[in-house]
């Protein structure tokens, strides 16, 4: 039992999917079970492994980046080509609150603490070679919002932040969900704003990068966030690429996230 995490259940490696395992654990933050898809590269052996926590979007779950995004296959390919160093990837569910939790706190349900506390603690307990003192956060769409906001809020615990096609305000979820969740999540409180936390923790922020497709309905919000960060003189990288809000775009550009993690992890290891 780790910090209230009881009886984690870990699968064997999934046949035909090297390095992929499925994990279910009791989460104190969620007050229920939570699911995680894990990828640990075979080439790592017992060497210390940085941890990337990769978040999904609305209507999704922990298996999305594996089954729809081919994340483990892309990572294996890049590792074999020498493009990245080995690191672990945890792909958790958002807690499965309604159509999407926004990775924020609801009544009796703390999706934020699930991501920054419970997931790293359980992964570390099961795989002691995984380093969790500082983790990398990344995600797509709603998961991009989660990575940017949680990463900025918990800046001292995060080594790098990357987002693809990010929701930049919770109100933007109205364009994706069909029930009252958007209204519930879209309270204009400062705690829910990316820019609020980036300003609050500007001197402690890790490296930040994000991108968006030029045919994505969220492009305007990403441009606005980029402009706001420039005005606030908060260092970051922003890019636009041809493409929409779909898996074709995310499969292509998650490679940038993997390189980003590898470069930072390599620099940290060299110090």
PLM feature spans:
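Non-catalytic cap/lid and distal C-terminal segments of serine-dependent acyl enzymes
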Residues: 1-271
């Amino acid at each position: 039992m780790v910090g209230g995490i009881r009886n984690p259940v870990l699968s064997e490696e999934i046949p035909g999917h090297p390095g992929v395992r499925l994990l279910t654990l009791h989460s104190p933050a969620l007050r229920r079970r939570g699911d995680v898809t894990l990828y640990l590269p075979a080439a790592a052996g017992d060497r210390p492994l940085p941890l990337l926590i990769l978040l999904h979007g609305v209507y999704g779950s922990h298996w999305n980046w594996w089954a729809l995004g081919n994340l483990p296959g892309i990572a294996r390919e890049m590792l074999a080509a020498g493009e990245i160093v080995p690191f672990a990837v945890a792909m958790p569910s958002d807690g499965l609150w309604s159509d999407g939790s926004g990775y924020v706190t609801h009544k009796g349900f703390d999706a934020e603490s699930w991501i920054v506390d419970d997931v790293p603690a359980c992964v570390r307990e099961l795989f002691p070679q995984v380093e969790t003192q500082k983790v990398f956060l990344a995600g797509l769409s709603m998961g991009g919002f989660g990575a940017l906001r949680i990463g900025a809020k918990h800046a001292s615990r995060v080594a790098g932040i990357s987002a693809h096609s990010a929701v930049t305000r919770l109100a933007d979820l109205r364009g994706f969900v069909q029930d009252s969740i958007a209204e519930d999540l879209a309270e204009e409180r400062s705690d829910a704003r990316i820019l609020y936390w980036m300003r609050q923790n500007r001197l402690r922020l890790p490296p930040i990068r994000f991108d968006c497709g030029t045919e994505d309905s969220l492009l305007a919000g990403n441009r606005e966030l980029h402009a706001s960060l420039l005005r606030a003189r908060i260092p970051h990288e922003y890019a636009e690429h041809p493409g929409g809000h779909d898996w074709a775009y995310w499969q292509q550009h998650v490679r940038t996230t993997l390189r980003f993690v590898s470069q930072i992890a390599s620099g940290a290891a060299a110090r």
